[in-house]
């Protein structure tokens, strides 16, 4: 059996028998989500929770002052940042910003893969956000939120983490980029669903992880469409031959201004603005 097939077999066996070690949501993200679900929470109390993690606090200030939110006046305190982002939106944004803590490894090759995966995920997220912001400009009442899409895009390949962690245990055999890419392509979605369920994430996030690589579309635009668009833009969509058909449909639905949408000035500006949240 090749090392490639051996890794897939090992992962599938562990997944079937609930033996695969799943990543846990960072503690600060758990605290923020619990606080956000408290009906009596207020902006000041939420800021106090976020302040428990200085790195996250700095991230939230950066988000609040990012070009993507389009505010010229800078905020200087967490209270101001939470107020600007919004109490409801903070739950998803804070969780999204805390996820980077999971992309670590003691093995240099695996760490390189995790760092690359995180960079790719941010790129996908920024493109998806850019397209949704464009779509919202002509569809004011669409029930889709940028904070939800941000988190959905950042976890759409979260199933890759246990694959990389497993490879870390057998670096001489599995820490080869080609093997890892094949395993991530074939198993990331299935593992990702299990992870998101274990974290108590809503079905809306699970659906994106399950469906982004598929072809199912509908007249009702959803978060999956924007993650899929971003994957197409990054040449990461697995069904390349179906891309023209999907792009024509998304063009007709108004998700993008033209087929080569990343060359559109507004999309390009939205993308650059979104990147300021992660720089």
Regions found by a protein language model. Name each.
Residues 5-14, 254-279:
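Terminal helices and disordered tails flanking the catalytic cores of nucleotide-processing hydrolases
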């Amino acid at each position: 059996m090749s090392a490639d097939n051996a890794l897939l077999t090992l992962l599938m066996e562990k997944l079937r028998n609930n033996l695969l070690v799943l990543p846990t949501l960072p503690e600060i993200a758990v605290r923020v989500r619990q606080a956000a679900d408290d009906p009596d929470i207020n902006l000041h109390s939420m800021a106090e929770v976020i302040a428990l993690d200085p790195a996250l606090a700095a991230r939230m200030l950066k988000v609040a002052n990012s070009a993507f939110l389009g505010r010229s006046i800078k905020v200087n305190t967490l209270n101001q940042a939470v107020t600007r982002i919004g109490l409801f939106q903070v739950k998803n944004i804070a969780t999204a910003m805390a996820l980077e803590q999971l992309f670590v490894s003691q093995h240099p090759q695996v760490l390189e893969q995790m760092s690359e995966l995180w960079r790719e995920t941010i790129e996908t997220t920024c493109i998806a956000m850019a397209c949704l912001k464009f779509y919202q400009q002509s569809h004011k009442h669409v029930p889709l939120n940028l904070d939800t899409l941000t988190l959905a895009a950042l976890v759409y390949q979260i199933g890759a983490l246990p694959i990389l962690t497993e490879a870390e245990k057998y670096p001489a055999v599995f820490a080869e980029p080609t093997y890892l890419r094949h395993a991530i392509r074939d198993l990331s979605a299935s593992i990702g669903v299990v992870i998101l369920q274990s974290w108590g994430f809503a079905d809306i996030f699970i659906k994106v992880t399950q469906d982004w690589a598929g072809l199912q579309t509908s007249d009702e635009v959803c978060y999956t469409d924007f993650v899929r668009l971003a994957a197409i833009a990054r040449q990461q969509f697995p069904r390349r031959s179906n891309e023209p058909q999907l792009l024509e449909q998304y063009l007709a639905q108004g998700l993008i201004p033209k087929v080569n949408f990343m060359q559109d000035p507004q999309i390009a500006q939205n993308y650059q603005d979104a990147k300021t949240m992660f720089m």
